[in-house]
C-alpha cells in the first residue's frame, strides 16, 4: 500500500469550497453520462449517524467506464471490469471516499479529507501514529507553481490569469500563499488535507501501479 498526504491551500473559505464541490460533482456526473456504456448509477443515498466524521450523508455509486476504453478491448472484457464502485461518507468539512472495482478484487483507493481554515500548516490533522506518519509521504500542492500537463491546461482556469468578477480575487502571484498568510483576515484561505491510500495487491506490479495511480489521480 502506498500512502500519501496531500495538502492543497486554496484562496477561498471552507463554505465557498463546499458550494464549489457540489457544483463539480454535478458537472462530473453530466460529463460521465454521454452514450452507451457510460454514466453514473446511484445505488444508495441516505443520511447516517455516528459514522465517519460524525453525522453525514452516505452515497453508493457505480461509474460505468466503458466509454473510456477502446471498443476492441471493451468487447473482450467482462462487464464487471467496466464499472468502478464509489462509496462516499460526507460529513463536511470531513469526507471519506472509497473506490473499488469488482473485477480487480485486490485493488482499492481510500481517500480521507479534512477542509480546514488554515494555509496547510496543521501538523497531524489525521491523528496518525508515529508508525503511520513514517509510512506516509507528504506532498504539498501549490495551485500556482505546480506544473500542469499541456493537454490539461486551460487559460481560463489558470490562477495566475483568472480574476473573479464576484469576489474580486485573483490573479494569484507566485508567492500567493505567503501573501495571504501575511494578511490574515484580508484574504480567505483554506486547505484541503487529503490522506490517500492506494492498494493494488498483485505480486510484481504492486509498487509500479500504486505509484502510477497517485501520479495521475
Positions of predicted regions on the chain:
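Eukaryotic helix-grip
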Residues: 1-217
Amino acid at each position: 500500500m502506498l500512502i500519501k498526504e496531500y495538502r492543497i491551500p486554496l484562496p477561498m473559505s471552507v463554505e465557498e469550497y463546499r458550494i464549489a464541490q457540489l457544483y463539480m460533482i454535478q458537472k462530473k456526473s453530466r460529463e460521465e453520462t454521454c452514450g452507451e456504456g457510460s454514466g453514473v448509477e446511484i445505488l444508495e443515498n441516505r443520511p447516517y449517524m455516528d459514522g465517519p466524521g460524525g453525522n453525514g450523508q452516505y452515497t453508493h455509486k457505480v461509474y460505468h467506464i466503458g466509454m473510456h476504453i477502446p471498443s476492441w478491448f471493451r468487447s473482450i472484457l467482462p462487464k464487471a471490469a467496466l464499472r468502478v464502485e464509489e462509496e462516499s461518507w460526507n460529513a463536511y468539512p470531513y469526507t471519506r471516499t472509497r473506490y473499488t472495482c469488482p473485477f480487480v478484487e485486490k485493488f482499492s483507493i481510500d481517500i480521507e479529507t479534512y477542509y480546514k481554515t488554515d494555509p496547510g500548516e496543521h501538523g497531524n490533522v489525521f491523528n496518525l501514529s508515529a508508525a503511520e506518519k513514517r509510512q506516509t509521504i507528504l506532498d504539498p500542492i501549490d495551485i500556482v507553481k505546480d506544473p500542469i500537463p499541456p493537454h490539461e491546461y486551460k487559460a481560463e482556469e489558470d490562477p495566475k490569469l483568472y480574476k473573479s468578477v464576484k469576489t474580486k480575487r485573483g490573479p494569484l502571484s507566485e508567492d500567493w500563499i505567503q501573501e495571504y498568510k501575511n494578511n490574515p483576515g484580508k484574504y480567505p484561505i483554506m486547505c484541503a488535507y487529503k490522506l490517500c491510500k492506494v492498494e493494488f495487491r498483485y505480486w510484481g506490479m504492486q509498487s509500479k501501479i500504486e505509484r502510477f495511480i497517485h501520479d495521475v489521480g
